[in-house]
Amino acid sequence: MTREHQGGTRGLAAARKGFWSGLRFTSLRLRLVLVFGLVALTAAVSASGIAYWLNREAVLTRTQDAVLRDFEQEMQNRAGALPEHPTQDEVQHTAGQMANSSQRFSVLLVAENADGTAVYGSSGGLGGVALSDVPESLRTAVNKEQKLTSANKHPYHLYWQRITDDGTPYLVAGTKVIGGGPTGYMLKSLEPEAKDLNSLAWSLGIATALALLGSALLAQALATTVLKPVHRLGVAARRLGEGKLDTRLRVSGTDELADLSRTFNSAAENLEKRVADMAGREQASRRFVADMSHELRTPLTALTAVTEVLEEELEYAGEGEGEGGSFDPMVEPAVRLVVSETRRLNDLVENLMEVTRFDAGTARLVLDDVDVADQITACIDARAWLDAVDLDAERGVHARLDPRRLDVILANLIGNALKHGGSPVRVSVARADHEIVIRVRDNGPGIPEDVLPHVFDRFYKASASRPRSEGSGLGLSIALENAHIHGGEITAENAPEGGAVFTLRLPQDPSPPADEDGGPDEETEDRGKDAKGQV
């Protein structure tokens, strides 16, 4: 199969798929077309049936009346002129004359000769009408003498019947000559009338099909007209769901669909105002946090310097114990508390400033070639976690990352595992599809299912009763933002055998391809260049 043929086949398949998807059985368009079609079909079939029946009766009645009238006249004029006891030749000759009338029917005459024997005369000779061709019920009715009354002046009457022989319709009639004489039977083919009626039926069928097709096209046009505003409303609703809050519908008319469009526009406008108000409040709160963080940083720097001096004094006092320490034993716990809380406050302010950088979009990567195993070891060693962490990482796994931000991610993940899951914490490193995969698994009970979706939310705590010393609720959020700025991701789940597992995925080289002018990406900086954007 050639490529052009394949493309044409795919295009045809797509067109068929689009057609059937547009006419799916649950669609309003198809239901409208079906309803219009059924109504049109019912009306057309009813009208065609009535028209066919009326025309059929009119055609058959007109032909039948003309034939019967002519036959009755021929019976009185020609058959009535026969002698009382005619011969075979006389009867045969009269039947032939009667058959040559304007209506051209076949005739059978039955008379009695002088010795009482029945004499038959057929217009077609031996191949003409036989008495056996006449239904017995008709012969009985013709030969039955009626009682004479004031309303019935003659003992015998004309009777007729429609029959079908070998698929051809016939009109059969019979009567006796008034005043006495032979009995006559007439056979008239109705095949020309049947052909005319068949042509009429075909014409009515074609008209019905055309009416059905026209109604389907009309229904399609009406459905398009009716559903076009609904389609526009659906498109606008999807755009609104995608966050395009300025989406509005053009309203025209005063019908129900126009009212629906006005309601949508009003709801969209109110939603846009609410979202803008919420965004303004969020922006104001972020500015407040950023301003407060910067305002707190200056006095906190001085306070941190003082606490470092106090901490050194505590160390000297401990070394000089027995020779007269400089701290009162009652004051020493308070000093240690001040030092600890000052450090915690300093960490909180630094975390808040980090968050404000992410929100403002000013965070930058300072990339360097990093041995991942060495980086993890350095992170664990700097925090004295070597005895509580099992590291499964071979050396030589290199990636181009920001060492400081990777250290922040690892410190938060491992520290969180030690704090809430307990030791030993297992850290493993693997490579998969140009990615570095770092898994941190603790030895605790795992994360509750209702908490899992919120572990990376800012300031989220699983319980409001948790002690405030357990953290600010920003660590995992900052770790996730640092992973995102690398183009990576962090996921949290519970291991089947117990314990929580945090999986960090980072690309080995997060730098996007250089632009055509060779300029570096604005979101990253090389270690060898100016690093003033480092946070």
Swiss-Prot record:
Enzyme category, top tier: transferase
Could you give one GO CC term from the UniProt record? plasma membrane
Q: Which residues carry this modification: Phosphohistidine?
A: H294
Compositionally biased tracts (Acidic residues)? 514-525
Q: Which residues cross the membrane?
A: 31-52, 199-219
Pfam family of the protein (one): HATPase_c
Write out the function statement from the record: Forms part of a two-component regulatory system AfsQ1/AfsQ2 involved in secondary metabolism. May activate AfsQ1 by phosphorylation.
The biased composition feature labelled Basic and acidic residues covers: 526-535
How does the entry describe its membrane topology?
Multi-pass membrane protein
Under which name does UniProt file this protein? Signal transduction histidine-protein kinase AfsQ2
Q: What is its EC number?
A: 2.7.13.3
